Structure formats: C-alpha cells, structure tokens
Amino acid sequence: ALAEAEIEYAEDPCHSIYVKFRVTDDKGLLTPMGADLSKTYFVIWTTTTWTLPANVAICVGPEFEYALVKSGDEYYVMATALTESAMQAAGKTDYEILGTLKGSDLEYMKTAHPFIDRTSLVIVGDHVTLESGTGCVHTAPGHGVEDYDVCHNHYPEIPIVVPVDSHGKMTEEAGQFAGLTTEEANKAIAQHLEDTGALFALQKIIHQYPHCWRCKKPVLFRATEQWFC
C-alpha cells in the first residue's frame, strides 16, 4: 500500500473506451421520445478498462442536460454538450437528438452490465464533469475514491465489488477474465466488448496516471477492509 504523498503522476498510454450499457428500466421517460428500450444504451467512458468488471453504477451530473440520440437503429443517452465529440469518436456522422432530460431525471434508471449478470444503477453525483467522455461516468466504488464516496454516502444499497486481488490479478468476481493481470484484462475485455457489440468506440491516448514514486509503475486502487486501534 502507498500513502497519498508517495504517488506521483506520469504520462501513460492507454485505451480511451466507450461502452454501451443497455437500458432495462427507463422510468417511462425515454420510450415517449421514441426510444426502443431493447436498443437503448447509456454510453460510459473510461480509461481503465480493467475496472469494468467492478462496475455497479453509472453516475450523471444532476444539473447537466442529457440527450437521447438516435443513430441507425440504436439510441444512446449522453450529455448534450459531449454528444458531438462522442459520436465523432465512434465515427458516427448521421444522428439526431430526439429529446433531452436533466441528469436528475435519469436517477434510478436501470441498465444491464454488458458482460456480467448484474444491474448497473443510474445515480447522480456532483463530481461529474463535462470535460471529456459522455457525462455518464463508469462507477466502480471498489477501485475509485470518488466512486466509493458517492455510493457509500448516498447509495448504500449499491454493492462494492473488488474483482482484483492483492497481486494485481482478476478474481472469480471478474467472471471469464479471472486469473488475468489487469494489463491482460484491458485487452481481453476490449476484445470481448467488440465481439459482443457492446463497444461504442475505442481510441488510444496518452494521459496522466498515478505511479509509485519508488518503482515508477502504475498504481492500482482497491477498496480494502481496514482496522484501527
């Protein structure tokens, strides 16, 4: 384990991945706009593909505007302000916005995890920004401080899943990816998403990522039980 003061940031190549989570309960708000729920998806964005087995929620900004976007025979939910860049990342030029809703309206909609038999609940959080991605934040409280805080403090019913062990390998909770290192899981998960049609877009980018100040290797964040005396 590392203290916060022992973490430094360095440039790291990674995949910028957009993933489709199919809507299973729209609270009766998307279908009146013309959406076919069997083909309607929240599109999340992440640069840590290996954390997707830990996803239990999708977080949106309560005051942001979100669009229902139609392209071909599919429908996507994403922040209106990021629609153009997200569709461009997917190479989609022919699309239309059917309607908009506030992020707070989306709270408690339900989606299906793309490769694990589990519901990913739509929640709201003030940490969501419109700087990049889709405004629909992949939420894995087992692997992120902000994710943990919003779920632990406001949605205690959401489970905290940590499918990575202390050696940096995926556990049985990661399903078919059990036994892989996180680096191996990045590639395997991206390939599986593409094979199953759940991949919206994939790009290679360079970003700032936390590294250990001693060994200079990327840091993995895990929620673990703690004891204090």
Predicted regions and their residues:
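Generic secondary-structure transition motif, activating predominantly at the C-termini of alpha-helices
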Residues: 60, 91, 193-197
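Residue patterns forming the tRNA-binding/recognition surfaces of aminoacyl-tRNA synthetases
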Residues: 1-53, 65, 108-112, 118-119, ...
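Protease-associated
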Residues: 57, 64-136, 145-149
